[in-house]
């Protein structure tokens, strides 16, 4: 007899209802719950899957390189990065006939194409690539690497090459290898690539496999290093007149601390970036030699954590027990990793536009908008995932005995104080911010805009001034002519910083006013509300006043059994579910703010944002409605244009988003009745009734319907806004 799906759960495989399929899909990646799973086997499976993950990433990057080399215009773009539109790939079969072919034929080629808005052209150009051959070589190299990773994944599942449980639990060795090898060594290697290949290329000197051993990246070679004259490597940097990619105005420095931006490319100085990576690499290599492994020297993480107790005694046993708790809980580890990655991804979104490191990317406005939006959304998903796995940790892995009176236990004991404080902050921010917006809306609607309550963000302006922004007249730290800090920064370190922060050519410390003050507090409200939902979900995951034995029902339970009425919305899963909507709401406000402020600055019309962002109708009318015209006019009775595909995606995104509500607003009984009606009709329809199924149709559970609704809501929301950002920006700036 053929075994039914899912093979990993005999109980599910024998379920006579369609539950078998849906629960099988839902638990496919929940390795812990699979039949016959041991802790060692669990670690081995996850470890092997990492290689598969890396293979997918390398294959995807290889595909980018290959398609640009084959169908793109990289070599033409290199000659004129500001005017030529970078091509991602060709469109094989443009629908809607000749008008479509014409609309999508651009970028200096004779066939219809998609324009790249990911910034890969700028990245490849900055790191020293100049020809299609360079791209092909990179593509083939990554393809080979992907194959090696797939093989490694397979190999590490074979009995001879499976690491044992002790190997996975050896925290100090893993830290040493990851800090020194993964972060340290790779940072130094990247610094080496920048010094040996990218910087010479930016000065018009090509370094390839044929000559890289003969070309000195610096006139003195390694002499300055071994004689201790390290400052020689910073002498004679590129001048302000340097033309990127040529010898004109170029210097010989390889490791500098100039600060600010290259005047022509408006990106960070490559020599500053190389210096940064070298310093980071050296620090991490040191850090990777700090933990005790073979020779009994260095730190023991267990000793450090067990010793961490507040001298006042107010934190009980402090970090005692955390070493074992974290080491034995993959969910705890994943939660920490997701939280860290979430924060850093949001920082990437911020830094990619404020401190652009790739040549000319600051002037590709569509790419700037796309990259910011992309990274903020990714950060949102990662952060919510961190709390979800934190909650699963509390349900599945938390041991009250092991954590007696330590910081984890004490956090659970005073969770009411944490939750009520977050609740108070959210209410305070919400009522005050909305109150200001609504007041301003009313007075503007009645024709007296001068009666608006406009609050200058003086504290934020003071922080900008202390970093060197002179326009506010605060005379503090770097913006005070008499301060030691200003003299040091101008003459000793980062001399280009002050010029950059006070220049109108970049997005570094943009001028802020009452509109920024209000939207800042709206975003603070959204962040605190999202955090409240997530923190409450995790802290109540083991039990709450209404349901003290919640942990016994697992991470996601439906409304359970007699006398359990009203428990539909209190599983840890439901907190994650609700938080997702708030997360999307938060990222929406963040990206609306960033995009509108930048679009008005790029158009030389910053006044529009400043005047209209202080009341809600301004946001609806002058941001959303005004910028949606390219999407509404993407195609009409007169034909189509190059934005038509985004107009269609905008519509389609709305449709998917709206479909979500069908699942979100209806509960289980509706679906059971609908399915039974459909089955009845199916069985009485000629031809259709020849197709039978063995599984008894069972409707979606409440949790499943919510998931289906959430996925539609999320995907539709993102499709809609992605199309809006790209089309509204491309419609203005090409």
Swiss-Prot record:
Membrane topology: Multi-pass membrane protein
SUPFAM superfamilies in alphabetical order: Photosystem I subunits PsaA/PsaB
Gene designation: psaB
Domain of life: Eukaryota
GO terms of molecular function: 4 iron, 4 sulfur cluster binding; chlorophyll binding; electron transfer activity; magnesium ion binding; oxidoreductase activity
Record organism: Guillardia theta
Annotated TM spans: 46-69, 135-158, 175-199, 273-291, 330-353, 369-395, 417-439, 517-535, 575-596, 643-665, 707-727
Protein name: Photosystem I P700 chlorophyll a apoprotein A2
Function noted in UniProt: PsaA and PsaB bind P700, the primary electron donor of photosystem I (PSI), as well as the electron acceptors A0, A1 and FX. PSI is a plastocyanin/cytochrome c6-ferredoxin oxidoreductase, converting photonic excitation into a charge separation, which transfers an electron from the donor P700 chlorophyll pair to the spectroscopically characterized acceptors A0, A1, FX, FA and FB in turn. Oxidized P700 is reduced on the lumenal side of the thylakoid membrane by plastocyanin or cytochrome c6.
EC number: 1.97.1.12
